[in-house]
C-alpha cells in the first residue's frame, strides 16, 4: 500500500511557520517510494508550498518525502547555509508576486512562474547580516508573546 510507517511524508500542515519539520502526521511505505518514483529530500532541505498556501517555507530536520503542493529547494550549498536561510526569509515575501493561477481549492504557482521569481541577492556578508537581523527581530516578537 501507499501509506505506511517507514518514510515521513510532509504535507503543508506539517510545516511550522518559518521553522523546522521534525515529524509528520503521515508516512509512506517503501513500496510507494519505488512504485511512484518519489524522491527522499535530505535533512536540511528548504521546502516551499506553491499550492493553496503559497510561500509557506520550512526546513527539513529529517529526511522525508512531500506531497505535490510542496517543492524541495536546493540552493548552492555552503557550510553555513547562508543562501538557504536567506531564501527562507525572502521566499514567503516574494512568492506572492509570481503569476498564480486560480484553482478549485485556491491559488497555485506553476514551475515557470516559480523559476521566474526575482530574488534580491547580495554578497554573503550582507546576507548573513540580514539573516541575523531578521532572527533577532523574530526573537523579540516571540518574547512579546511569552
Model-derived segments and their meaning:
Residues 116, 123-146:
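Amphipathic alpha-helical segments with low aromatic content
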Residues 14, 91, 131-135:
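Generic short alpha-helical hydrophobic face used as a protein-protein interaction/packing hotspot
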Residues 3-6, 40-44:
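Short, well-ordered loop/turn elements at secondary-structure boundaries
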Residues 48-49:
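A generic structural signal for residues embedded in beta-strands
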